[in-house]
Amino acid sequence: LAAIRDIWGGGGEFSYGRVVLTAYAAARLPVDDALADDADGLVAAMLAAGLDRDAMRWAGVVDDGSVGWAMLALADPDGSAMVSDGELDGFVDDDDSPRQHKSRMLLAGLAGLGRVADAEIAEYGERLGIDLAAQTRWTRMIERAAEVDNPALVTMLAGLGMQGSGWDRMTARHLFHIVSALRRVGLEAEARMIAAEAVARA
């Protein structure tokens, strides 16, 4: 763990590549409540490499309402349970990211994966100042590609929708449509990982 921390906190500007670099080392660590302070980072590292099953082992260690909890709520490959109003409320209340961007990404990801009720989408969309239903030419194109079950076109349009100088430029609306479309064409694993990464990097 000390070596992992050294990589995360190395000199120079922080790079998400450092998180990716530690993915397999993080996956080899035993699940331990004593590592709770590092659990969010360890979960982010594992999910950066798509190691969702390894990351899910830490579900009992991450704090409720933490970033680690949010990433696992999105990444869970067996996720059939809906995220409740209370769980969302706790996360939003504690979110100190700029413009509550992590909360926006969480809501968009959960909505795209069908893991939050319509009532919560409406309530928290208003609370966070986002409208996932608003349409643009791009949203109509990716929705249509999903309707006709064209995973190649959905993937291409998802890539276009993710263009930008950083994850701070990713909008909740774009993430929602990307995740939803990927899930609808059978690329749910990719949808889950993108949603989790969006929260990690927001």
What are these regions (language model features)?
Residues L1-A202:
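Alpha-helical solenoid repeat scaffolds
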